[in-house]
A protein has these predicted regions:
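ATP/NTP phosphate-donor binding region
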Residues: 1-77, 88, 317, 326
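Short Gly/Thr/Asp-enriched flexible loops that form oxyanion-binding sites at enzyme active sites
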Residues: 86-99
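Glycine-rich phosphate/pyrophosphate-binding beta-alpha loops
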Residues: 152, 211-227, 292
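Gly/Ser/Thr-rich active-site loops/lids in small-molecule metabolic enzymes
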Residues: 167-176, 218-220, 227-247
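N-terminal glycine-rich "phosphate-gripper" loop used for MgATP/nucleotide binding
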Residues: 80-85
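ATP/nucleoside-binding phosphotransfer catalytic cores, i.e., glycine-rich phosphate-binding loops
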Residues: 2-11, 198-200, 204, 230, ...
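Catalytic core of DAGKc-family lipid kinases
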Residues: 26, 40-43, 48-49, 56-58, ...
Length: 326
């Protein structure tokens, strides 16, 4: 009962307030869609719940400026439609203000939207958020840089870098470019040599991949994506692959796709409120929510418990329109 009361206390009614909506016109789900009809459908969904809506559909180069303008306006709720990169930008900008963020799943992966149980069908997503509720969720950060999903070190930053180079050079789509980059990288699998400390003293690990997630992942058989059932546990998920060869890593990747990764004895998992990664290198590369970064070690990871107010579909079974209070 105490847990239920705490959860209720962290939730508030949703729309029915001044709302700014920014759409990335080039986001995957909008390609080939009549943008005027999409804009009208979003506006109507929120205005039916009493929201005062200002909506902009902008090109990718203008997204950051549009998000900043929305945050600096008198809007209480800022809704962003785009991929994980667009969402990552919005979170870093909105977090210091205490304003509410809403996410429309318009990208390829839509990881946070999935974990918030937001429908991926656009019409359903509009309605679910328009009648939604405000929740407080955790964010993770490393050396002051905020992320919502995961921070990945090891071979993966090299894969992402190769993928982007191939997309630019050969004009490949994202997934074919990713496949080619993965094959090239894991043939000569690089190992990360670091010491990690989560409060029990530093321990050396040599691994092809180290993942630090914002809240732990849950084993979900048959799921091709890593999922989180909780976004407010106050814990980081830490995952260290013990495999040091290509075939072992491929086996782990296969189990991840099948949703059976938790049964891999060569994957070490733990949870912690904070984690420090030490290295002899001057810089370490990582991929945070799809963005490649370089940082000087030590890397200081921590969780910021319930630091972000976010609009999410209702979870209490309330009827449509219940979130529309003034």
């Amino acid at each position: 009962m105490m847990a239920a009361s705490a959860a209720q206390a962290s939730r508030q009614e949703g729309p029915g307030r001044k709302t700014a909506i920014i759409l990335n016109r080039s986001a995957g789900s909008l390609v080939g869609q009549p943008i005027e009809e999409t804009v009208a459908a979003i506006r109507n969904a929120f205005e039916r719940q009493g929201a005062e809506v200002a909506l902009s559909a902008v090109e990718p180069a203008d997204c950051t400026g549009a998000i900043r303008k929305a945050i600096e306006s008198d809007a209480e709720l800022v809704i962003v439609g785009g991929g994980d990169g667009t969402i990552h930008t919005a979170v870093n900008m909105i977090l210091p203000t205490g304003k509410i963020l809403g996410i429309l799943p318009l990208g390829t992966m839509n990881l946070l939207a999935r974990d918030l149980k937001t429908p991926l069908d656009l019409e359903e997503a509009f309605e679910a958020l328009a009648t939604g509720e405000v929740r407080s969720i955790d964010v993770a950060e490393v050396n002051g840089k905020v992320y919502l999903n995961s921070s990945v070190l090891g071979f993966y930053p090299q894969v992402v870098q190769e993928r982007e180079e191939k997309r630019k050079r050969h004009r490949l789509l994202k997934w074919p470019a990713m496949g080619l980059a993965l094959v090239r990288t894991i043939r000569r699998l690089p190992l990360l040599d670091v010491r990690i400390d989560w409060g029990e003293g530093p321990r050396r690990v040599r691994t092809p991949v180290l993942v630090v997630s914002n809240n732990p992942y849950d084993g979900e058989a048959g799921s091709m994506l890593l999922r989180r059932n909780s976004l407010d546990s106050g814990k980081l998920g830490v995952y260290v692959a013990r495999q040091r060869d290509t075939w072992g890593l491929l086996r782990l990747m296969g189990r991840t796709v099948l949703g059976t990764w938790q049964h891999d004895e060569e994957l070490e998992t733990l949870t912690a409120a904070q984690l420090t990664v030490h290295s002899r290198r001057h810089r370490l590369k990582m991929v945070n929510d799809g963005e490649i970064l370089q940082m000087e070690p030590p890397l200081n990871y921590r969780i910021r418990h319930k630091a972000l107010k976010i609009l999410a579909p209702r979870t209490d079974g309330a009827p449509d329109g219940a979130g529309g209070g003034a």
